[in-house]
A protein has these predicted regions:
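Sec-dependent N-terminal signal peptides
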Residues: 4-16
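Hydrophobic alpha-helical segments and helix pairs
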Residues: 106-149
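Beta-strand/loop substructures that line and gate deep hydrophobic ligand-binding cavities in soluble
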Residues: 95-115, 250-268
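Terminal, regulation- and interaction-focused segments at domain boundaries
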Residues: 21-62, 120, 142-215
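Mid-chain, structured segments of secreted extracytoplasmic proteins
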Residues: 65-108
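A cross-kingdom marker for long, charged
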Residues: 206-295
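Short, cysteine-centered beta-strand-loop-beta hairpins and adjacent loop/turn segments enriched
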Residues: 76-81, 115-118, 225-231
Length: 295
């Protein structure tokens, strides 16, 4: 009986610790004097050799000093598709690179931060599997560097699951619907064709299509100089470059995005209201751009 009691106490203590654990949106992995190209090659190799699938890469804001590598894992895709409220958005993880003078900084989105925010309800049942994927990704990046320094702020699991920037600001569940098509196939074809044509000054970074589930996700480069990445990243901070690219998701016959006021704040949780006001038009600009992909 004493043994059972002790095991119960240990379990409850461990569970409480997990519940209260702070997560940062990013981990700084390495600093070196390598080029962007060398860094990208090493990242792709390290992830591929650890069982991850490379989805795509690009230069945010069309900058020669910035790059992002997007990747996923088969188990993550499987789990994400079980979350009906846009869970597939969490399928793509990202590594960011920034060349600052002679120094190349490599950082990654913290997988658990994103999982807690995007999976919302029901994450507890998959937490061990998700933690395993997160640990595997971080371990893979140790082939690049061993710094593993959290940055970008901290939030507890419980707050991430119900995250919003301020009162009256949107939550994850307040996704913005862009268009309802007659069918999934029509929506898929329309968005694919528009991305191929670069409509709205966009470019496809990656694409995930699950035809049997009628779900598709795209990472989209926002290339308009006046209201795209080149406009807002320098203002809110390109140290968080791994936040990009922005996503559009097609579920069933409905295309939607996460509201800019939610997604930007989630990836820049330390952003002051003063700085946020400087990009006041950005959430609307992003929505307008993404809508063009559905027309």
């Amino acid at each position: 009986m004493r043994r059972i009691f002790l095991l119960t106490v240990i379990y409850l203590f461990t569970f409480s610790a997990i519940q209260a654990q702070d997560e940062s949106p990013y981990l700084l992995i390495n600093k070196s004097d390598e080029s962007l190209a060398e860094g990208i090659t090493k990242i792709k190799s390290a992830l591929s050799e650890s069982g991850f699938k490379i989805l795509g890469e690009y230069s945010p804001a069309q900058s020669e000093k910035l790059a992002v590598v997007c990747y996923t894992h088969p188990k993550l895709e499987e789990i994400a598709l079980n979350f009906s409220d846009r869970g597939a958005l969490a399928s793509a993880l990202k590594v960011g690179l920034k060349k600052e003078g002679e120094t190349l900084k490599i950082s990654m989105t913290n997988p658990m931060y994103m999982f807690y925010a995007y999976f919302v309800d029901g994450v507890d049942e998959q937490e061990m599997a998700l933690r395993s994927i997160s640990d595997q990704a971080i371990k893979a990046m140790k082939n690049i560097g061993t710094m593993e320094v959290p940055f970008g702020g901290t939030l507890e699991k419980k707050k991430l699951q119900k995250y919003h920037y301020k009162v009256m600001m949107p939550y994850f569940t307040d996704a913005e619907e862009l268009k309802t098509f007659d069918s999934f196939d029509e929506g898929l074809k329309t968005i694919q064709q528009n991305l191929k044509a670069g409509k709205g000054e966009t470019e496809k970074v990656y694409e995930l299509v699950y035809t049997d589930k009628e779900v598709a996700v795209w990472g989209v480069a926002l290339k308009n100089v006046e209201d795209g990445e080149a406009h807002f990243l320098p203002i809110i901070g390109d140290e968080h470059v791994a936040a990009m690219p922005y996503e559009i998701i097609l579920q069933g016959n409905t295309a939607s995005i996460l509201p800019g006021k939610y997604r930007i704040a989630l990836h820049w949780p330390e952003l002051t209201m003063g700085t946020f006001m400087k990009i006041m038009s950005t959430p609307g600009d992003i929505k307008t751009t993404m809508e063009k992909l559905t027309e």
